[in-house]
Amino acid sequence: MAILSHEYWKKFIEKDKNGKEELINVFEETQRPHFHDPRAPRFLLTDQQGKFALGIGGYLKTTMEYDFNGIVDDVDFIPALIPQPGSTSVRNQFQMDASTSTIFLKLVGRTKHLGNFIVYTAGNFRGSGKTFELQNAYLSFLGFTMGYDTGLFMDLAAAPPTIDFQGPDGMTFYRATQLRYEANVMKGLKVGVGVEMPSVDGTPAQDVRIGKQRMPDIPAYVQYSWAKASHIRVGGILRSMTYEDQVNNKAKSLTGWGIQASGTARLGGFQLYGQYTYGRGIAQYLNDISNLNVDIVPLADESGRMQVLPMKGWYAGLQYNFSKRVFASATYSQSRLFTEDCYAHFNETQYKKGQYLVANVFWNVSHNLQVGAEYLHGWRENFNDVNREANRINLSAQYNFCLLYTSPSPRDS
């Protein structure tokens, strides 16, 4: 067994005669592209034959937050959680958070029948009472991935960089237990399809119970890449949501669906990001709206019946790379819940629209240390047209127990 720090990888590669170079390359080629995911592991444990390598890494991150002229009732900046009028007189708030600090283990192996395979587990301290919470636990081989991971109905590489852990409202982000298959069918063209564990968040109603689900969620996508860190992607998801009509003692189902277009492109020192999502009954997948429990909602004046509402989310962002160590970005996003069958009439104080504006700058002080500063502004509008706003300043310091990816542009998966 050999233990290697990342600084010695190149020396190790030069002396390699047992296929270990290929394993090290797999670590970097399969690096997760989301801004908040940890980078390549700093330490490796390898076996004598060079068939297996275990990477250990993570980061410690501390954030200071100050809200002014309106607050958000959470450590993440979620416009849906801007307090309702009259619920609080507090207009300023100071918070600190270290719960997004992350630890991961990544095993890479080579076998005769499975080829290169990956076992990845990661977690942070976002559990109840800041306890450890699993974020990823999956096995990948031959294009298949099984386990718990971020969902397939999202585009990690097209997400803009933020200190705020949630990210823009209207962006698709969720995690699910799943089985998926992804393949490169030709140069630049990649496809994926999966089945995911369903989870339905609905508004409580008399004579209705949301319980066991009978069908998996089915996401799929097609992605075309024309250069490093440049791609467009079109995806969709189909879901069946079961609820119990206790008036007629009958199980009923509603169909939810969503479509999405996303992408990112590198133009000189600039990086562009964007996403647009529209659908029905897809609330749990969209930032901001996912806090409202509106996958399915009661149908007005009809006891025991539910309905699905239309909704959308989108964002557009721009990043400029001043150098390999310094970059800045700005993103605007919006999410919207639409009404049908008098839903707004009976829920006037319900969220109708959220907006999110963020601007930030990051400095990679060294391979291990990154600091950042960020301004956020959020708006919440209800169906009765009442508006509330909030502002936040974030400051962060992140020390990486892994190799910091100093190139500030995303990596395509």
Residue locations for each model-derived region?
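N-terminal periplasmic/intermembrane-space "pro-region" immediately following the signal or transit peptide
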Residues: 1-68, 407
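Outer membrane beta-barrel
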Residues: 45-76, 86-200, 214, 219, ...
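Sequence/structural signature of outer-membrane beta-barrel proteins
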Residues: 67, 110, 124-128, 153-155, ...
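Repeated loop/turn-to-beta-strand initiation elements of outer-membrane beta-barrel proteins
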Residues: 112-114, 143-146, 187-191, 229-232, ...
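Transmembrane beta-barrel architecture of outer membranes
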Residues: 134-136, 176-178, 215-221, 231, ...
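Detector for outer-membrane/organellar transmembrane beta-barrel domains
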Residues: 227-351
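Conserved small/polar residues in nucleotide/adenosyl-binding loops
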Residues: 405-412
